Amino acid sequence: MQISIIQKGLEGWRGSILVFGLLEGALESQLNALKEICTPASLAKALQDKEFVGKQGDLQSFQLIGKEPREIVLIGLGSAEKLVLDDLRKATAISCRKVIGQEGTLGILLPWDIFDSDIAAKAVGEAVILSFFKDNRFQKDPKQKKLPNKLELLGLPESSQKYLSEIVPICSGVKLARELVGAPPNSLTPSALANQAKEIANQFGLEAKILGQEECQAKNMGAFLAVSQGSDLSPKFIHLTYRAKGEIKRRIAMVGKGLTFDSGGYNLKVGASQIEMMKYDMGGSAAVIGAARAIGELAPSGVEIHFLVATCENMINGSAVHPGDIVKASNGTTIEINNTDAEGRLTLADALTYACELKPDAIVDLATLTGACVIALGEELAGLWTNSKHLSKELKESAEACGEGLWEMPLQDSYKEGLKSMLADIKNTGPRAGGSITAALFLKEFIKEDIAWAHIDIAGTCWTDKDRGINPAGATGFGVRTLVNWASRSINP
């Protein structure tokens, strides 16, 4: 989609569809701006059809016969005093769903001056592209609905144009993550995920290293390989590297959980555990690879970034790991596996150990790790655990800037008692109470004390069963935009 700024606003504008945002109250004075393109009589008639007062979510549209624009969509924004940036994203998404099926030039006019206009322009541009997303790759005869092919943001200063260049790369990363999560497990295998990572590396000049089973064995990745041994498909360890040109001010690592399918192993997923949805157990790896795609194109300065994924399936065969087995991670820690369905943390144990060996300034891992996090925070907030106040601040600011919900949770050290094993150094699960906290504490065992680390549990946020904000039903691509924002902020630690 081509995106541009039209400084003059509605003066002389003749696009195909106009989205016009209205604040609650004083509608008449705001609607005066539309006199450039339609008569007061047509406006009055449209508003008589349905009560429209400008509340958030109020929506009204009407057509102009024989004129351009051919349709005007009025969207309520609510009170100016309560309006936040994410309200613009949501209003934009609602409006975009209204115009699916139409083509041409989409113009959007909102009260930009309430916010930093540059930031608002970027937020709205992202909302348009991401709300139009539709994944129909696996249909015999996909019906491609018509969509606008041009977006014009009306009434913004020309200076905002430079920020628009970031929109398409970021949205391309999010869309890639959505496609990866949405792909069925017979399509997205560990090898297919590794091949996708290599394609990203080749396209954007990243370094790529893919380790097979023997190479992982040579690195003593006993925890990761224990999970993979029940599958007929070979595990892969993915390592992409982005290095900015010039001076490197900060080295960071992004680690994603990459279970392309999770049966639960011998602790088989049954009943309400939604085994049929366990294709999305690689949502963390999708976010990391999507971020790699966006960062590769954006090419931020001053930073070196390592993207790491240990990918495999968790299946059942004669070689599958047993409940009660003891395995050794690559840092030497022995782990009693008291639940084979707590496999993601086993793969992450070796991935985080590998990340620490790169001596980064900070590590962030993303994982669809626990149902406990979903129970605690629902489907709009991801959980954040970290050993660094500064990293916490960076990530929360990065998430807030793009409208991704992040809520910090405690690393309650006393809960580590629940991970004690009679035989090994540690168990892979603790008691049911505080399950998301003990999962984070388990991961912390594989982080060196001098490295800033954060764990983000995206179990509730990587998928939505219904349209929500800028996310159509399906995979959300959650985490990509937060990671990209964090990468750009990382040059000023």
From Swiss-Prot:
Domain of life of the source: Bacteria
Annotated residues for binding of Mn(2+) 2: K257, D262, D281, E343
Catalyzed chemical reaction(s): Release of an N-terminal amino acid, Xaa-|-Yaa-, in which Xaa is preferably Leu, but may be other amino acids including Pro although not Arg or Lys, and Yaa may be Pro. Amino acid amides and methyl esters are also readily hydrolyzed, but rates on arylamides are exceedingly low; Release of an N-terminal amino acid, preferentially leucine, but not glutamic or aspartic acids
Gene Ontology CC: cytoplasm
Statement: the UniProt record of this protein carries the keyword Hydrolase: yes
Record-listed E.C. numbers: 3.4.11.1, 3.4.11.10
Residues that hold Mn(2+) 1 according to the record: D262, D341, E343
GO molecular function: manganese ion binding; metalloaminopeptidase activity
Any Pfam family: Peptidase_M17
Cofactors named for this entry: Mn(2+)
Subcellular location, principal: cytoplasm
Signal sequence, renumbered to the chain: none
Subcellular location: Cytoplasm
HAMAP family registered for this protein in UniProt: Cytosol_peptidase_M17
PANTHER family with a match to the protein in the record: CYTOSOL AMINOPEPTIDASE (PTHR11963:SF23), LEUCINE AMINOPEPTIDASE-RELATED (PTHR11963)
Protein name: Probable cytosol aminopeptidase
Organism the protein comes from: Prochlorococcus marinus (strain MIT 9211)
